[in-house]
């Protein structure tokens, strides 16, 4: 192993730059050459590859987004796309690859592994929906972004004695909604993994009113329904004319938290070590504060599950 490359793919997540920095500096420390691939798998197929030095990743640790850029390239799921990618890797004499991203990125990494190219996956997505790890890079930052907004919205909800609905990201996973709702004391948390009944939500709000509560916050993951649709349905149950805030892509941006920076640094360094050990086809993660690695194929077979105990706790504490 003399030369490795790194790419970021799919939706950006705060901490991707920190992970890239760790990969580059750890690899150079170990005597390897490092190349950056712009625009994910699209850039790989097009040969948009550049050499990275120690200085290339300076002033990156605190920056959100990804300086390697990102793009979605569904064509990489085809044999033609994968063979073009491997052709470019061989052309640039690259011996191993690190892929930072979510579920779709892992599918690309697995495809390269099956074709005999050593590839390591690093979980980078704000949704925290990757198996094999307790946390993904970017989740903690997104969580704190949502919590900051929730706290501010509660101020105005209190002032005007209103119900507010906050729509957060999470098409298939409700981790952002759950964790932010618990941390922010939301009166109701609506996630894709748990069915909900509007009668139960209204009953919870009514009980709050009966004991003097004059405002409420409901956090809704976008994968369940839009915040506006939820407000429309809620309005059919009486005088709950809620205001809606859609946080959108602000959740993806911002300077990564200390937790995400440290996590990204640890995972990036371990990815390089695995390539040096000739152990491709793995994805790194963190379990109980220990860095672990798992087979990418096995991770893709597993479905991310919501922390049921945490969900139940949030329900109890929001009474």
Curated annotation (Swiss-Prot):
A Pfam family per the record: PFK
Keywords, in A-Z order: Allosteric enzyme, ATP-binding, Cytoplasm, Glycolysis, Kinase, Magnesium, Metal-binding, Nucleotide-binding, Transferase
GO molecular function, one term: AMP binding
PROSITE patterns linked to this entry: PHOSPHOFRUCTOKINASE (PS00433)
Protein name per the record: ATP-dependent 6-phosphofructokinase
Biological role stated in the UniProt entry: Catalyzes the phosphorylation of D-fructose 6-phosphate to fructose 1,6-bisphosphate by ATP, the first committing step of glycolysis.
CDD domains noted in UniProt: Bacterial_PFK
Gene field: pfkA
EC nos: 2.7.1.11
Description of how activity is regulated: Allosterically activated by ADP and other diphosphonucleosides, and allosterically inhibited by phosphoenolpyruvate.
GO biological process: canonical glycolysis; fructose 1,6-bisphosphate metabolic process; fructose 6-phosphate metabolic process
Superkingdom field: Bacteria
PANTHER family, per the entry: ATP-DEPENDENT 6-PHOSPHOFRUCTOKINASE, PHOSPHOFRUCTOKINASE
Family: Belongs to the phosphofructokinase type A (PFKA) family. ATP-dependent PFK group I subfamily. Prokaryotic clade 'B1' sub-subfamily.
Record-listed ADP binding positions: 21-25, 154, 185-187, 211, 213-215
Positions of ATP binding: 11, 72-73, 102-105
Active site per UniProt: 127
């Amino acid at each position: 192993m003399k030369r490795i490359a790194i790419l970021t793919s799919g939706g950006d997540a705060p901490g991707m730059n920190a992970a890239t920095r760790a990969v580059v500096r750890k690899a150079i420390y170990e005597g390897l050459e490092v190349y950056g691939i712009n625009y994910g798998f699209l850039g790989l197929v097009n040969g948009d590859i550049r050499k990275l030095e120690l200085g290339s990743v300076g002033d990156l640790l605190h920056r959100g987004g990804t300086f390697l850029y990102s793009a979605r390239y569904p064509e990489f799921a085809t044999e033609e796309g994968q063979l073009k990618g491997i052709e470019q890797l061989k052309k640039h004499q690259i011996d191993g690859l690190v892929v930072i991203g979510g579920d779709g990125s892992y599918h690309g990494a697995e495809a390269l592994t099956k074709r005999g190219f050593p590839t390591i996956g690093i979980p980078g997505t704000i949704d925290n929906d990757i198996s094999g790890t307790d946390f993904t890079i970017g989740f903690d930052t997104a969580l704190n972004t949502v919590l900051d907004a929730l706290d501010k919205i509660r101020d105005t909800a209190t002032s005007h004695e209103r119900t507010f609905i906050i729509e957060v990201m999470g098409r298939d996973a409700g981790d952002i909604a759950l964790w932010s709702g618990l941390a922010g004391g939301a009166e109701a948390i609506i996630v894709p993994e748990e069915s909900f009944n509007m009668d139960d939500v209204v009953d919870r709000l009514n009980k709050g009113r009966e004991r003097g509560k004059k405002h409420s916050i409901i956090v809704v993951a976008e994968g369940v329904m839009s915040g506006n649709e939820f407000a429309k349905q809620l309005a059919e149950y009486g005088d709950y004319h809620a205001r809606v805030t859609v946080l959108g892509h602000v959740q993806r941006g911002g300077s990564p938290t200390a937790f995400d920076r440290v996590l990204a640094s640890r995972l990036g360094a371990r990815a390089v070590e695995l390539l040096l050990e000739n152990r491709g086809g793995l994805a790194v993660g963190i379990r109980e504060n220990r860095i672990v690695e798992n087979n990418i194929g096995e991770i893709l077979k597993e479905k991310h599950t919501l922390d049921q105990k945490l969900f139940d706790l949030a329900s109890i504490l929001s009474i």
